[in-house]
């Protein structure tokens, strides 16, 4: 357990390092430490460490995939993407990012890496592991009952706290998820700096996933660093205030669920609201004429 904690902590630091390499920023040591501290005090980080989740171990893999894509090393990009998906299948969402860029080589290498990972895992640990995953893990993900639990902070969690009827949950959740997904796809097709689009994919993933647990929101490290550095460089004080508010909403946690009768669904969806705000701030950059 101690080894896993140390590995996760080192992966957290490495994630920031790769992020600054992607952004091509030589950050001062003090600024780097402040970012680390802000990550450590947030609840998603503490939740990840406490639950023994591999979120921080996987994050550098998806970041390295983009870093090598950025540096035209497509084979390595595809391999790291495949490794990330092998650890967290939900990161298959990023295959869409590269497909929209028509990066067929990255797509092919990622699929090859996934195939090799499946064969290696099945050969070493037996195929019953995949049978269990398909029969016991996947089916509950398609069931929308219990999605209103506080720790679920995606679109479906938010909708489930408002709508009791399972059928309506599915409809409203699908409509909102489609809206977020289409917005992300349309903006990713534009010939802009791909960093903006890559950042948007992180945010969209957490909104669309039907089970976005609070510990998953550590993956917002890249969008938060990217937007904060962009707003600082542009001296966008108002946007920095909104970004800070977004961070506070995402980082907060109620140890005791408050008994709030008025707009309780809003209070209990603070991470979702903070992520939506982050989504809007990221989109706002697409409409800046000088970017």
Residue ranges, per PLM feature:
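Alpha-helical transmembrane segments of multi-pass membrane proteins
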Residues: 43, 205-206, 225, 247-251
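Residue-level detector of transmembrane insertion/anchoring sites
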Residues: 45, 78, 93, 270-274
């Amino acid at each position: 357990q101690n080894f896993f904690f140390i590995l996760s902590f080192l992966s957290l630091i490495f994630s920031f390092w790769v992020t600054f390499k992607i952004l091509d920023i030589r950050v001062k040591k003090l600024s780097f430490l402040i970012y680390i501290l802000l990550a450590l005090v947030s609840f998603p980080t503490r939740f990840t460490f406490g639950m023994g989740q591999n979120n921080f171990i996987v994050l550098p893999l998806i970041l390295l995939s983009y870093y090598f894509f950025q540096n035209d090393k497509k084979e390595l990009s595809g391999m790291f993407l495949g490794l990330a998906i092998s650890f967290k299948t939900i990161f298959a969402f990023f295959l869409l990012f590269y497909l929209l860029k028509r990066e067929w080589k990255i797509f092919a290498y990622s699929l090859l890496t996934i195939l090799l990972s499946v064969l290696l895992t099945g050969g070493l640990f037996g195929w019953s592991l995949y049978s269990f995953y398909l029969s016991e893990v996947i089916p509950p993900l398609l069931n929308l009952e219990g999605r209103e639990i506080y720790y679920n902070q995606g679109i479906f969690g938010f909708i489930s706290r408002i709508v009791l009827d399972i059928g309506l949950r599915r409809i409203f959740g699908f409509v909102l998820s489609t809206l977020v997904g289409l917005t992300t796809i349309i903006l990713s097709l534009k010939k802009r700096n791909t960093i903006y689009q890559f950042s948007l994919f992180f945010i969209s993933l957490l909104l669309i996933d039907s089970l976005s647990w609070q510990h998953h929101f550590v993956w917002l490290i890249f969008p938060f660093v990217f937007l904060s550095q962009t707003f600082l460089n542009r001296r966008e004080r108002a946007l920095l205030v909104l970004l800070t508010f977004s961070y506070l909403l995402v980082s907060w946690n109620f140890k005791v669920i408050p008994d709030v009768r008025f707009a309780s669904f809003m209070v209990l969806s603070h991470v979702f609201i903070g992520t939506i705000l982050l989504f809007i701030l990221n989109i706002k950059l697409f409409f800046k004429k000088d970017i």
